């Protein structure tokens, strides 16, 4: 992978963040998320009033989410320089990014369907709205595994010039822990553990975007490292190197 391609992939996270800011906040008006305690008539009215914005916002977020995959791939490729198994942890990270992208795209499509026909029964629109928010916010396990896999890869990168500083592995682990409250939204319609609450939505979302920013900066730094500091083959013992 050339340096230019790596740099393009590394900028995928900022692109996705901008897309979410424009789509989720600007067009759909889903910040804060719609209250799970609102009745069907209220939800149906919101989707009717914002039907164009919700559809545009969903399209923008679908496009932006796709940039998670190249970003995850280039981030996963950095500690791989010294990973002994040459594949398990990087593949896990990319697999989680693909799963996370698919989850978000499915949620966006559900909201498009909910906004597509405002003359549907309010209860049906509410069901689609609920389904979209549950799918987009609740699947914390995918993001936890993604972060933990990257953290383990950073810990395993014990060469003389590791791609990422060791503290970033702890950041990955703590961030993964902060995603867990999102799973509680299945049991609450009000309060901090509802899908519009501080613990189920805002804390995981803020943690995720901080993680994206920090890992993007560290990845750009790793990519721009002088060639002399690249130790892709330096960890292979001389006795195991194949003579030319």
Can you describe what each PLM-predicted range is?
Residues 1-244:
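Hydrophobic, aromatic-enriched alpha-helical segments typical of multi-pass transmembrane helices
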């Amino acid at each position: 992978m050339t340096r230019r391609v790596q740099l393009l992939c590394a900028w995928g996270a900022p692109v996705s963040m901008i897309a979410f800011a424009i789509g989720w906040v600007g067009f759909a008006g889903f910040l804060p998320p719609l209250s799970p305690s609102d009745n069907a008539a209220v939800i149906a009215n919101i989707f009717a009033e914002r039907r164009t914005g919700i559809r545009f916002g969903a399209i923008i977020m679908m496009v932006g989410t796709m940039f998670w995959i190249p970003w995850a791939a280039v981030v996963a490729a950095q500690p791989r320089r010294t990973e002994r198994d040459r594949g398990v942890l990087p593949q896990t990270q990319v697999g989680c990014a693909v799963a996370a992208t698919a989850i978000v795209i499915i949620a966006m499509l559900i909201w498009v369907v909910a906004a597509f026909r405002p003359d549907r029964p309010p209860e049906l629109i509410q069901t689609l709205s609920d389904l979209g928010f549950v799918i987009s916010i609740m699947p914390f396990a995918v993001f936890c595994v993604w972060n933990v896999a990257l953290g383990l890869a950073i810990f395993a990168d014990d060469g003389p010039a590791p791609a990422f500083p060791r503290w970033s592995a702890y950041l990955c682990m703590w961030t993964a822990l902060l995603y867990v409250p999102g799973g509680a939204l299945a049991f609450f319609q009000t309060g901090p553990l509802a899908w519009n609450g501080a613990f189920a939505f805002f804390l995981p979302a803020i943690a995720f975007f901080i993680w994206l920013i920090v890992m993007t900066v560290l990845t750009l730094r790793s990519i721009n490292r002088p060639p002399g500091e690249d130790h892709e083959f330096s960890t292979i013992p001389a006795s195991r190197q194949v003579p030319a």
